[in-house]
Amino acid sequence: KIAPTVYTGYPGGDWRENLRLTADALNMVEEAEDLMKDYDKKVKEAAKKLEKYQDKTFSIIRWQGNNAALILKELPAGRALTDLGLQRPPAQDMEGKGHSEPVSQENLSDIDADYIFFGTLGGSSVGNTQAGGSADTEGAKEAIAEATKVPGFEDLYAYQEDHIIPVDGSLWTSTGGVLLMNAIVDQVVEFLV
């Protein structure tokens, strides 16, 4: 006999839809709706605190070895910035394919913005011998130091203005649900206010 199996969405999918599917399967629809309402309330309060940043642009990148990848609007961190009313630079103001989008070194300027949330997944990069380190903020700080060796990185506006914000890559550059979304919103406020 096989236990009941439920499809609850896919990584990179809309976290609200994934939560609704799971809640429906577990008979917890009201609880899920409460979680989403609480998130919306948190976002509304946070957006008020972030009003002075509404005309700034924000990039979210994952750095692996000596290369960057963009976290676009469909991934959780991108959705959180959109929810907060924060703008993305033109090269990132779009939905992606549900995963990070690699950026060649020739197009490194595509990661630039007024502020860059900079994460890494450390040694998790398959086949990349330069991908040492960890995914936490200390790992991001180490990756930023390594990134300065890449031609053009120090020319980025965000770097020159000291607006590169190291973040936990496992949180900011991965997929997740309501807990992850709340944590990202909390961190945006913590980093900027």
Name each region found by the language model.
Residues 1-4, 113-116:
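Proline-aspartate-enriched helix->loop->beta-strand connector
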Residues 57-63, 91-92, 117-120:
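Short, conserved beta-strand edge motifs with alternating hydrophobic and charged residues
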Residues 64-68, 123-125:
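Short, catalytically relevant binding-site loops at active-site mouths
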Residues 70-100:
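Alpha-helical, coiled-coil/dimerization segments enriched in small aliphatic residues
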